[in-house]
């Protein structure tokens, strides 16, 4: 049986935590930042966890994570 392929775009976006959950960086922090408040940008810097409904999809894309 051949090896399963890792989805490279998912590999760059998601990291598996020690407890088995997946974390990712929040969006809306790349450009058009002048109109966003400092508080909003500060809160967007924090990593967020993948929602439970999406975990199966991420696991399928990252078989060796």
UniProtKB/Swiss-Prot annotation:
SUPFAM superfamilies: L35p-like
Pfam families from the UniProt entry: Ribosomal_L35p
InterPro entries named in the record: Ribosomal_bL35 (IPR001706), Ribosomal_bL35-like (IPR021137), Ribosomal_bL35_CS (IPR018265), Ribosomal_bL35_sf (IPR037229)
Segments passing through the bilayer: none
Key words, A-Z: Ribonucleoprotein, Ribosomal protein
GO MF terms held by the record: structural constituent of ribosome
Presence of the UniProt keyword Ribosomal protein in the record: yes
Superkingdom assignment: Bacteria
Biological process terms in GO annotation: translation
UniProt region (Disordered), positions on chain: 1-26
Comp. bias regions, Basic residues: 10-26
Keyword Ribosomal protein among record annotations: yes
GO CC terms of this entry: cytosolic large ribosomal subunit
Cystine connections: none
Residues annotated as signal peptide: none
NCBIfam families found in the cross-reference section: rpmI_bact
Family stated for the protein in its record: Belongs to the bacterial ribosomal protein bL35 family.
Name by which UniProt lists this protein: Large ribosomal subunit protein bL35
Annotated organism of origin: Hydrogenovibrio crunogenus (strain DSM 25203 / XCL-2) (Thiomicrospira crunogena)
This protein's encoding gene: rpmI
């Amino acid at each position: 049986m051949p090896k399963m392929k890792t989805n490279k775009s998912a590999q760059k976006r998601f990291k598996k935590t020690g407890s088995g959950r997946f974390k990712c960086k929040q969006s809306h922090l790349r450009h058009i930042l002048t109109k966003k408040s400092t508080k909003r940008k500060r809160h967007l810097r924090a990593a967020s966890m993948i929602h439970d409904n999406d975990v199966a999809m991420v696991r399928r894309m990252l078989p060796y994570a």
